[in-house]
Amino acid sequence: YTLNGYLQQLGASTRVIRNDEVTAGELEQLVAEVDGVLISPGPGTPTDAGVSIAMVGIALRTGVPLLGVCLGHQAIAEALGGVVTHAEELMHGKVSRVRHQGDSFFAGVAPEFNATRYHSLAVVRDTVPESLSITAETESGIVMALRHRELPIFGVQYHPESVLTEGGYQQLGNWLAVAGLPNAAGLAASLSPLLVQEW
């Protein structure tokens, strides 16, 4: 619910739906009533995540802005033909340096930033389908963010809602701007927590 709280602070009206609460058909009807969908983190694999894979298909058909976080990011990759497998290293509450490629999702975010990771699965880089571009990665080349080349579909492996993730509010605000809340990106800059680092 932290992600939900961040979205509300950025001006979004939200509704939380569990991935096993609705059928794919019911989900399609619900999506027709919203301006954007976020597939949140969770346990398990994308194929075990209820209607998450179906949601990606709906976004592909309807063009509704979609953001996948952690498991949601993996669901996007898998739905489009990518492979998700066990990560080389378990990352539970660990911070990594992430470098982005200048995509608009990262507007206002430093080219390299700290991101908090909680995952044991990862998208296999060599299997990322042509329809997706890799927009951020770790120093060792682990895929940290994806974007559909033609549709407003984004995924991040790390947790933008974690207090130790730099620029998390900004990234969510940028996505909300794509989903129809143009003021969210500007508001995000004023809400981003100031991290003090000891030297």
PLM feature segments, named:
Residues G11-E21:
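A short beta-strand-loop structural module common to alpha/beta enzyme folds
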Residues V22-V34, T127:
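Short amphipathic alpha-helix with an adjacent loop that forms part of the alpha/beta core around
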Residues Y1-L10:
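Short, charged N-terminal beta->alpha structural module
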Residues C70, H119, H159:
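Histidine-centered divalent metal-coordination motifs
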Residues S104-E150:
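Catalytic beta-strand/loop cores that center a nucleophilic Ser/Cys/Thr
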Residues L30-A107, E112-N114, L172:
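Cysteine-nucleophile active-site neighborhood
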Residues V163-W199:
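Acyltransferase
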Residues E150, G155-E166:
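Phosphate-binding/catalytic loops
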